[in-house]
Each structure stands twice: as structure tokens, then as C-alpha cells.
Amino acid sequence: MEKFFITDNTTDNTTDNTTDNTTDNTTDKLTDNNSIDNDKINKNITVDSLTNDLNKLSLKSPSDKSSSGKSSIPNKSLVPNKSLVPSKIFFSKTTFFKIKLDEIMSCHNITISDLNSIKNKIESKNLQIDEINTIIIGKILKKLGLYKYHGHEQYILNIIIGKPVQKMSSQEKNLIMKLFDQVLVTFNLLKKKYNWNNFLHYGYLIYQLCKLLEYNDFLDNIALPNNETIIYVNNQAWKKICSHNNWIYYEISQIKN
């Protein structure tokens, strides 16, 4: 059987606060992730500097269009005034999104002992590397009582199979945060028209923003909701948000394992 090796990008510190906001219940509403610590609010995030930051990162300008006429990045002229969003909602959702982004994109601190326990459980099942997926990792975490890593199955899988874990730069994170501001304002503008009760799933949204910005190296680290209906509902909302902002729409057609 193929041997498993632990990569060097782990530390001895545990992350106790990693959580997952997904649900296995079928629903026709968008998932709700409103819990937030207001003391962590960063009120310095703005949308206004978006164009300058894009230029600094040498990304495509808002005028660059695909053959379909859709822009690969936000067009500043289409950004609604963020004063349309109640300030409490704007800053709480922005802060919670930042926390989730940091959880997903940072190199999560998994102890060597926990990783060895996961590896030993895999070996006891006589599984080959190509047989391991996030569902199996999730079941192993549950059996071992490692609930603090729930929602980070993809990250752990990448370590187990020896796949390099990409780290996101502060510039890339800041740009995603600014795009999130625009998404939040657009969502608030459209929610009455389409009867949206809750915000998009954060893992889904992070995945789509990375896809929009062509940050493809990070996609394998992002856990999507483990529910086809939730993905479908989020796809429908995201398609309308992209259409409103004249962005390219990428549909997620299936759950990643």
C-alpha cells in the first residue's frame, strides 16, 4: 500500500474555532450565517479603492470584456451606494466573511498528533491515496472526535495526499474583501425583488470570488456545501448578482469530493 507522509506545512498549534455553516437539510432558502462578534469589526474596508487596487495587481481592467460581453472583474460604475445597506448588517457580514476567509485561506494549525491519528485511521482501512476523498476524511474526523477540524476536510485531504497548500497574500485577501463589499450591496439591492431571505453560503461565495478573480490555485482548499439543493439555490442567486454587475457567471454543477 502506498505510504503517507506528513508535509512540513503543519504546526503544533490547534485551531479551536474552525466551524462549518453548511447544513445537510434540504432547503429552498439561502443559508444564514449571521453570528458575529462586533468587537472584531473592521470599519476601514471600502469599495471606492477597488479600481486602483486592481490596477496595482495588474488584473484586467473593468473595461476588459469576454466574448460574451461580461467583465471578468467588477465595473466600478455598477457598484451601488453601500449606504443602501444598514451599517450594522454591512459591517457584521463583512467581518464574518473575513473570519471565514482567514479560516479557509490560512494554513490551519493542525497538530502532528491529530494528523497522525487521521493517517493511522486511513491506513487501518487499507485505503489507497486515490480512494480518499473529503467524505471519508469527514467520517474519520467524526470517529476520532476531532470536531474542531469540521469544515476543513479538503485542507486535511490535501495534506494527506501531499498536495501543496497554497497561501493567499494580503493583497489577494484585500481584493476579495472589496469584491465581497460589492456583492453585499448588490444582494441587498436585489433581495426584495427575488424574495431572498438569507445571505449566500460563505464557502460558496469565497469559491466564486476566487473563480471570478482567476485565483484557481486556492479552489481546492475551499469546502463547498455538501448539499445539491443549497448549491443550486446559491447558483441561482449568484447568477443574478453576476448579471446585475455584468460579471462572468461560473456555475458550480456538482459537489466536490
Curated annotation (Swiss-Prot):
The keyword Transcription applies. Keywords: Transcription, Transcription regulation. One of its GO terms (biological process) is regulation of viral transcription. Signal peptide: none annotated. Residues 26-35 have a biased composition (Basic and acidic residues). The keyword Transcription regulation applies. It holds the Pfam family Pox_VLTF3. InterPro entries: Poxvirus_VLTF3. Residues 7-25 have a biased composition (Low complexity). Residues 1-35, 58-77 are annotated as: Disordered. Belongs to the nucleo-cytoplasmic large DNA viruses (NCLDVs) VLTF-3 family. Putative transcription factor. This is Putative transcription factor R430. It comes from Acanthamoeba polyphaga mimivirus.
